[in-house]
From Swiss-Prot:
Belongs to the CbiX family. CbiXS subfamily. It comes from Halobacterium salinarum (strain ATCC 700922 / JCM 11081 / NRC-1) (Halobacterium halobium). Seems to consist of two fused copies of the CbiX domain, resembling CbiK arrangement. Keywords: Cobalamin biosynthesis, Cobalt, Lyase, Metal-binding, Repeat. This is Probable sirohydrochlorin cobaltochelatase. InterPro entries: CbiX-like (IPR002762), Sirohydro_Cobaltochel/CbiX (IPR050963).
Amino acid sequence: MQALVIVGHGSHLNPGSSEPAYTHADTIRESGAFDEVREAFWKEEPSFRNVLRTLESDEVYVVPLFISEGYFTEQVIPRELRLDDFDPDDWDSDGTDADHVTLEADDVEKTIHYCGPVGTHDSMSEVIVQRASSVTGREEFGDDFGLAVVGHGTERNENSAKAIYYHADQIREMGVFGEVQAVFMDEDPEVDDVTDFFDTDDIVVVPLFVSDGFHTQEDIPEDMGLTDDYRTGYDIPTAVDGHDIWYSGAVGTEPLAADVVLERAADAGAPVGDAVDAVREQTRGANAAAGD
């Protein structure tokens, strides 16, 4: 038997923090790609520490629903899963290309395929573009539309910014938008000044966050000038400094993000069959239905 475990941060304060993990788990569960699909969290139950004990499968694919490589993916998750032989160097990553490593969890007698985070997978760029399509209702953009990919940014983890720049570069090479920029909450270039970085009339702003919470629902809209008080709401798009800003909310809530989880497991050797294509078709259908 084979199992998939999606591990997320969770929150004691924001019940929506875990929602993407449950939603994407349900999507993958319906595909039938795995005998078991579980969710586990740092700040909620079921916990990282106990999740492996809930599985009957002897082979487990663990996919972190995190944006970047760093403290949680390199220290907390391996420690809590008791992957004693894990070494971040085994990923041979420069901060954006962690793949997977196979280890034994001896206390539960299971083989664990520990994957890199969803946020640095190549296919996340496609999810960002799809998120932009979902908020604008457009399948094509062209030179009149710019895209701002928003990250948290932090001096404590340089990989946090690397993931944002990585996807901004990839999307720029796709030629989908007239302009593509990476911006941040806590470092330059700052999201507060997003209109300064674009000549396009329309700017789609997509936060590379797993879930919607205080940053995506309160801080970023106010920082960009969409509203003085998030509680009063704002229009989509909102005119700011001569530009129309289309703000999408967290990319991790996009249904297509389930595909990234599945692709991470497939890259680690999970025999998912045609589940990737099935999930892509299902999640794109969800987007179309939402736009009706």
